[in-house]
Amino acid sequence: MGQSNLGSVIEDHALERVPDGERENWLVISWNTVGLITTLVILFFGALVCFVAGVRIALLAGLLSFAVGSGLAFGLARIAVETGHSNTLITRKYGLGTRGSALASVIFGFLIVGFLAVENALLYRGFLFFFDLADNWSSRLLVYGSMTIAWIALTAWGFGVVTRTSSVMTVGFFAVLAWMVGHMLLVGGGEGELLFARRLDAGTLSAMGITSNVDKFVFAFNLLVGPACALALNTADFGRYGKSTGHVTAAAMIAIGMQSLVIMLIGGILMQAAAPTMVEWLAATRGIPSEEAGRQLLQSPDSIAATFILFGGVAGFALMILAQAKAQVLNNYSSSLCIANLFDALFRWRPGRLAFVVLANVIALAMLYGKILHFVEDWSKLLGVL
């Protein structure tokens, strides 16, 4: 009996309906949805749209992103509650059929496993920066190996452990983030920075094809709505445990609002306050002119991790861990459900969800080795447009 219960916990109803007796309220589900979007990548997207469009235009784009994502989330919430299935399994049983569901699993799986890979890379470079490690195979095996084991161990035990992990880390994230925001605004410029206009010069914007306020709005919306809609799809993976459509919709809307407005704004404000110091640091450490350092500041989410560590030291490093670790557990969880549906739909192969937890991490590591992570951001924006 004990082995049967353990197997059931690990399998976590991956390819079946979640029983009514295991359903949870909006708060429990919110720990997972909010945990997914409180990450360095979302903070980076926020900084990018604020620097390109300015805070006011970015907020308008965020409002539209919130509306679109919430509408999609409401529809998926209702379906998830009534069916009790994950998002890709829903497409197989109630929409696209077996082949269509397999295609949906490939599309969604590339995005979610891609984020698993991207955020692994962010954590890796954060470890290198904080501990002053060399980027060699020893460091890669140690850091990537340790992280992969941690994600598998925390994801293997199903919804309950995933939710508890996310709740603890989300509370810690917001506590440390509040301290960091106050500290960086105090050091970097204070309240005068809150509603800044675009920071990039006209020449840089023109090279990006952005020549008007409409272009700025479109750029900001495309970058924000992709993660918002991806989060709406994730709603089914966690919402299948919801007690009602209202509970699941509330959990999704809280998270999408945080992603499209709050975390976006915080990312912009933090990087605006930190920009002068970061430009000086980049120019000094890389031996490049200040103008070039300013352009490099927003070329990669690495800048967010470096900013936190430079300004916050141990607290900044802790914030990076809290932001990324919970998201990795949640990404791994959704990835395992998606891949389980893919293999069941195509090959009728059901080795158990744990096998797909491991496979998702293997694919993420392969993405890192293949250096294809730049496709993930483009894919996110493309999904937003579609």
Regions found by a protein language model. Give the residues of each.
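Membrane-interface "cap" regions at the ends of multi-pass membrane proteins
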Residues: 1-59, 177-180, 187, 207-221, ...
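Hydrophobic, small-residue-rich membrane helices and short re-entrant helix-turn-helix hairpins
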Residues: 18-26, 157-170, 230-265, 280-289, ...
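Transmembrane helix-loop junctions in multi-pass membrane proteins
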Residues: 41-56, 79-80, 118-127, 152-161, ...
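Juxtamembrane transmembrane-helix boundary signature
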Residues: 63-96, 105-111, 117-120
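Hydrophobic transmembrane alpha-helices that form the core helical bundles
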Residues: 101-135, 321-341
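Membrane-interface loop-to-helix entry segments
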Residues: 124, 142, 146-190, 196, ...
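Loop-to-transmembrane helix boundary motifs in multi-pass membrane proteins
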Residues: 139-146, 341-373
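Hydrophobic alpha-helical segments and their helix-loop junctions in multi-pass secondary transporters
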Residues: 172-206, 220, 227, 267-276
